[in-house]
Amino acid sequence: MTSLREFRKLCCDIYHASGYKEKSKLIRDFITDRDDKYLIIKLLLPGLDDRIYNMNDKQIIKLYSIIFKQSQEDMLQDLGYGYIGDTIRTFFKENTEIRPRDKSILTLEDVDSFLTTLSSVTKESHQIKLLTDIASVCTCNDLKCVVMLIDKDLKIKAGPRYVLNAISPNAYDVFRKSNNLKEIIENASKQNLDSISISVMTPINPMLAESCDSVNKAFKKFPSGMFAEVKYDGERVQVHKNNNEFAFFSRNMKPVLSHKVDYLKEYIPKAFKKATSIVLDSEIVLVDEHNVPLPFGSLGIHKKKEYKNSNMCLFVFDCLYFDGFDMTDIPLYERRSFLKDVMVEIPNRIVFSELTNISNESQLTDVLDDALTRKLEGLVLKDINGVYEPGKRRWLKIKRDYLNEGSMADSADLVVLGAYYGKGAKGGIMAVFLMGCYDDESGKWKTVTKCSGHDDNTLRVLQDQLTMVKINKDPKKIPEWLVVNKIYIPDFVVEDPKQSQIWEISGAEFTSSKSHTANGISIRFPRFTRIREDKTWKESTHLNDLVNLTKS
């Protein structure tokens, strides 16, 4: 059985390793001949763990300030300089209530059992007892590691691809399809990964699109032909049906709110009369009586009431699984043809996505112009012969703000990283916001632009919605995760960028700025379009996405 001390050393070695191959080799060498491979891999990937601990960084600080009898304010101030694991380690070492162990005695199994128990309680008194109990058997470094597991970020600079491909060269790709970590590890030991398929009622990583800034680029990407599909301004939904059971998952593989999808339980059996089990990729949109899509955000309970005679409508664009048959390795044109054969449209309830077979550039331009004229979001372009590759950005999306050559071809989904005090009537409140993106290579957050122009009501709401730490433009208080140049140091930084809001930012064009840290990329005349509540930081525009977006 692997000890927590061994696991901590592995994490340290992975962090200091220079690249993908070296990190994966370290993991592969470590798990070889160990019986608890699954547990090791599971804990190396805490972000994939579906256990919920009901506490963020601020709550962890609050609870441990009570346990250690330390100043909560001092602990929060220390957190502003780094991250939660270091803060807890520092104050555990200094506290006089619980003496840290001199020698590590915990196994990974002990830690995993603790995490399971912690996920089952919600009362603060119960959480305090459990956190006290685990601290009493930890060294300072042990507790730091446990807290980072609760926070679901070990900061080892190694994501799922690095870790899973240490098991087998194609384990990561298989995982994105099956989403079953235990099955992958068991089958890898038997060299039988190819047998793993989609499991109905278990979410699949959705296939994604990268931004496209020209019609010419689209034809270079798909020289053998493409489908142009309307990009619906709704919410991505993966539909699973197994006999009379249903499951609905969002783009980040979380359950969709029931009020948005409950109606589908009545209509899916009518639209797919021959299907016993099925998995669909689709978009749910609120439409009017003429099946015209209504604005994004109208799916909410209160917002929907503003639109009389409206209906929830499922626009189906792919069939991934049908009655025991995994269809993801079949070319798109065959999947689409099959979908046409097995699905019966129910007007305003379940319909096919609008799809056009494109053969030349002028046709694509016409289809794009038509979509924008109808005030639709744009187009998604798909290889006509393409297979469905879970989690991969093989499609292209065009949703232009401006049609003129050289103008910004797409908006960017950026994360709120900080804020500045406003001036004049807006003095004393956060009125200007620092927007940025995540750099997968460095594990840091980089700045892209500042954004303002919100109305008074929106600003009033944002003061409460955004969880900020006041740093008063002090360079010494810039958190470890943020890379920002001196002239853009904000008055406030977000407590946790991975929990921050994602805003769609549009502008006249992408520009070069030596002052911003996202490879010098910025946005000219940035403007806030909307909050992307349907996305997590993982689906936001990362630095590599931004670089691709600016290439013409």
UniProtKB/Swiss-Prot annotation:
One of its GO terms (cellular component) is host cell cytoplasm. Induction: Expressed in the early phase of the viral replicative cycle. ATP binds at E229, R236, E283, K382, K397. One of its GO terms (molecular function) is DNA ligase (ATP) activity. The keyword Cell membrane does not apply. It catalyses: ATP + (deoxyribonucleotide)n-3'-hydroxyl + 5'-phospho-(deoxyribonucleotide)m = (deoxyribonucleotide)n+m + AMP + diphosphate. CDD domains: OBF_DNA_ligase_III. Keywords: ATP-binding, Cell cycle, Cell division, DNA damage, DNA recombination, DNA repair, DNA replication, Early protein, Host cytoplasm, Ligase, Magnesium, Metal-binding, Nucleotide-binding. It is found in: Host cytoplasm. Pfam families: DNA_ligase_A_C, DNA_ligase_A_M, DNA_ligase_A_N. SUPFAM superfamilies: ATP-dependent DNA ligase DNA-binding domain (SSF117018), DNA ligase/mRNA capping enzyme, catalytic domain (SSF56091), Nucleic acid-binding proteins (SSF50249). Mg(2+) 2 binds at E377. The active site is at K231 (n6-amp-lysine intermediate). Mg(2+) 1 binds at E283. Its cofactor is Mg(2+). It is an enzyme of class 6 (ligase). Its main location: host cell. InterPro entries: ATP-dep_DNA_ligase (IPR050191), DNA_ligase_ATP-dep (IPR000977), DNA_ligase_ATP-dep_C (IPR012309), DNA_ligase_ATP-dep_cent (IPR012310), DNA_ligase_ATP-dep_CS (IPR016059), DNA_ligase_ATP-dep_N (IPR012308), DNA_ligase_N_sf (IPR036599), NA-bd_OB-fold (IPR012340). One of its GO terms (biological process) is lagging strand elongation. Its EC number is 6.5.1.1. NCBIfam families: dnl1 (TIGR00574). DNA ligase that seals nicks in double-stranded DNA during DNA replication, DNA recombination and DNA repair. Recruits cellular topoisomerase II to sites of viral replication and assembly. Contributes to the repair of the viral genome following UV irradiation. Belongs to the ATP-dependent DNA ligase family. Interacts with host TOP2A and TOP2B. This is DNA ligase. The gene is OPG180.
